């Protein structure tokens, strides 16, 4: 699905008790979306099914975070992350995501499962400048892959500087 959605700056918010749930196949194509996901993303169920989960990627979201996410999932580990998503109408919404691999009976990864909740606004205000710095690093490079790797290195450097791992950092915000 090709899209040219431009961010409008309008922010939408999940309810305190709402939970976005989605499942994807091994390539990140959506195989399940609950009603909250459909409402927040503003796509129909039919539009979401089979579409890459990156359909809702906001341009202010550093690619380095997604590299870490995919690296972690491929290592058969879960990951928590703050993510800003872009809805079909250009509005956006922040989530605190918990993403896990789904395994078959032999321990092989067969897909991915994500639960997303409303994050605390204080945590979002803490992560925004970090994401802005990482996106700026990505933008300094003509080649997107080079930018992602430079941003990833900057993120790793920040974590080393603070003496924490990614999980500890995210859960301490």
Name every feature range the model reports, one short phrase each.
Residues 2-134:
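Sensory/regulatory domains in signal-transduction proteins
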Residues 110-113, 117-173:
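Juxtadomain coupling helices with adjacent low-complexity linkers
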């Amino acid at each position: 699905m090709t899209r040219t959605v431009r961010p409008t700056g309008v922010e939408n918010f999940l309810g305190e008790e709402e939970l976005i749930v989605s499942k994807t196949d091994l390539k990140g194509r959506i195989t399940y979306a609950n009603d909250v996901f459909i409402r927040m993303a503003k796509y129909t169920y039919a539009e979401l099914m089979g579409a890459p989960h990156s359909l809702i990627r906001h341009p202010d979201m550093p690619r380095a975070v997604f590299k870490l996410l995919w690296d972690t999932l491929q290592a058969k580990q879960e990951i928590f992350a703050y993510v800003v998503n872009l809805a079909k109408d250009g509005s956006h919404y922040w989530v605190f995501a918990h993403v896990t691999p789904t395994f078959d009976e032999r321990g092989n990864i067969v897909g991915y499962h994500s639960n997303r909740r409303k994050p605390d606004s204080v945590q979002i205000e803490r992560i925004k400048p970090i994401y802005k710095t990482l996106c700026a690093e990505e933008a300094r490079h003509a080649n997107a892959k080079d930018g992602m790797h430079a941003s990833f290195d900057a993120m790793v450097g920040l974590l080393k500087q603070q003496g924490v791992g990614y999980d500890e950092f995210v859960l301490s915000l």
